């Protein structure tokens, strides 16, 4: 059980509450506890949390940023706005998801295909476009620029980068794989989609956003460009050293620099929870992978947890991090925003997941070794408890198990100190998937954790045979064979 320090008064915790019911005080306390731990040690940190449960919105603000009107950069969550506009265009029958994107670009772009396979509109929103991560490309700065100066250099590259520059550089893009196959983060795809939507609707992107989203939802503090009378509400962003960071240049706003506050984002999440809306429902459908394990919607990451479908996304900029979690069938959502970047994504996602789990599951349910995994893992655990952990193959007979989930479950056991049980599950996975280099790599780690160096070496070598490009195996073998 996780324990939290009783230091709430010292942190200037402030919470604004909606009308309470019998259950919300416990939820409020959980948020307070989580926030206390999060903020401790960072005097610059502000934190805003919105929780939606049973159609009630609860908003909490903590630390140095203490108002639900404070503006944060929301990073890549901006892409879900653009995705929603594309879904609206589909519902309006202005476009089809399998349309070649070049139908909506002025000029000739023969390069935006791979072996005759074009980039389609769908690929721009499910991370499979094969477009570069950023334009202008700043990857060359890595290793050449002081990390503390990197953000400022990137801003310099972008501050005079125009729409014309973007489409000029788009001519030079070379795809390295068939679009639609490999998920890969791309701010370029997000920015390009906004430009295409402008061509489709013959309106500026900012006007489209106001017409179909922010205006409709009365999101008066959500902007691509913050108006002068609201600039005082824009929080300062920091890295994990407490150094103030620059804001993202507005020319990439549709991809990763919308500014908003917790009040507006709570309205947005409430809108996203209503899947009676055809456009919303479309954005939550798996277009790559599946919701049972891991899937991609329209810039939404999809999964399932204890039989409940989850829809989530995170966003980072140079000085801000945000995370949102939706559980549509329970009408539950969490939005968390903070003015710090640096190892914050995992902290925010863990906070959101903890709030969800502690709200809907008992302590006994949460203590199960299979908690959070599919029914198949629950069935396997039941059989293992009956037959013994040294009979994994027999216990797994007749159960449809996913390699990645079994691997993740084994690592979960490892994190909870169950080293031998984790190794047993790693062994099961290699038995089920004898041609998987990753399964052997994981089993090698399992042997390493129980102190069996000889077998760790054997299985890392086997993993390397299956995939000579497995750099982790190379690194571990060098360490183990010293």
Predicted feature residues:
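Active-site-proximal loop and beta-strand segments within enzyme catalytic domains
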Residues: 41-45, 65-185, 203
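Catalytic loop of the DD-peptidase/beta-lactamase superfamily, centered on the K-T-G motif
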Residues: 23-61, 103, 136, 144-145, ...
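Helix-start (N-cap) detector for alpha-helical repeat units in TPR-like alpha-solenoids
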Residues: 80, 403, 437-441, 471-472
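Active-site SXXK
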Residues: 32-35, 49, 55, 73-101, ...
């Amino acid at each position: 059980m996780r324990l939290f320090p009783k230091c709430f008064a010292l942190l200037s915790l402030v919470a604004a509450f909606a009308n309470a019911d019998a259950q919300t005080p416990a939820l409020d306390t959980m948020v307070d506890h989580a926030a206390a731990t999060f903020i401790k040690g960072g005097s610059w940190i502000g934190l805003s949390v919105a929780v939606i449960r049973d159609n009630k919105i609860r908003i909490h603000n903590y630390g140095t940023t203490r108002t639900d009107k404070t503006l944060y950069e929301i990073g890549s969550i901006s892409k879900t706005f653009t995705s929603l506009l594309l879904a609206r265009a589909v519902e309006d029958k202005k476009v089809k998801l399998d349309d070649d994107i070049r139908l909506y670009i002025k000029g000739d772009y023969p390069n935006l295909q791979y072996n005759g396979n074009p980039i389609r509109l769908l690929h721009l929103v499910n991370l499979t476009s094969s477009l570069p991560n950023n334009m202008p490309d700043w990857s060359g700065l890595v290793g050449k620029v002081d990390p503390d100066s990197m953000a400022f250099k990137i801003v310099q590259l972008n501050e005079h980068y125009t729409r014309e520059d973007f489409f000029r550089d788009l001519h030079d893009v070379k795809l390295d794989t068939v679009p639609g196959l490999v998920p890969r983060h791309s701010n370029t795809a997000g920015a390009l989609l906004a430009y295409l939507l402008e061509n489709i609707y013959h309106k500026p992107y900012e006007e489209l956003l106001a017409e179909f989203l922010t205006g409709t939802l009365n999101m008066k503090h959500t902007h691509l460009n913050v108006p002068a009378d609201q600039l005082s509400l824009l929080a300062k962003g920091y890295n994990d050293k407490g150094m103030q960071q620059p804001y993202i240049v507005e020319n990439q706003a549709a991809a990763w620099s919308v500014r908003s506050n917790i009040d507006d984002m709570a309205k947005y999440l409430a809108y996203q929870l209503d899947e009676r809306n055809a456009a919303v429902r479309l954005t939550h459908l798996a277009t790559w992978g599946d919701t049972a394990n891991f899937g991609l919607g329209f810039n939404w990451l999809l999964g399932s947890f204890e039989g409940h479908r989850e829809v989530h996304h995170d966003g980072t900029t140079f000085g801000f991090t945000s995370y949102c979690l939706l559980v549509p069938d329970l009408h539950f959502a969490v939005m968390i925003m903070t003015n710090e970047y640096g190892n914050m994504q995992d902290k925010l996602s863990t906070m959101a997941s903890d709030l969800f789990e502690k709200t809907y599951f008992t302590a006994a349910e949460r203590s199960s070794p299979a908690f959070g995994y599919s029914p198949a893992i629950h069935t396997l655990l039941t059989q293992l408890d009956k037959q013994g952990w040294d009979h994994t193959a027999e216990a797994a007979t007749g159960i449809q198990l996913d390699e990645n989930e079994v691997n993740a479950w084994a690592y979960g056991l490892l994190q909870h100190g169950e080293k031998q049980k984790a190794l047993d599950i790693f062994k099961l996975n290699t038995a089920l998937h004898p041609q998987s280099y990753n399964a052997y790599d994981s089993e090698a780690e399992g042997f390493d954790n129980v102190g069996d160096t000889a077998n760790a070496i054997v299985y890392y070598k086997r993993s390397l045979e299956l995939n000579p490009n497995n750099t982790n195996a190379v690194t571990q073998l060098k360490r183990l064979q010293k």
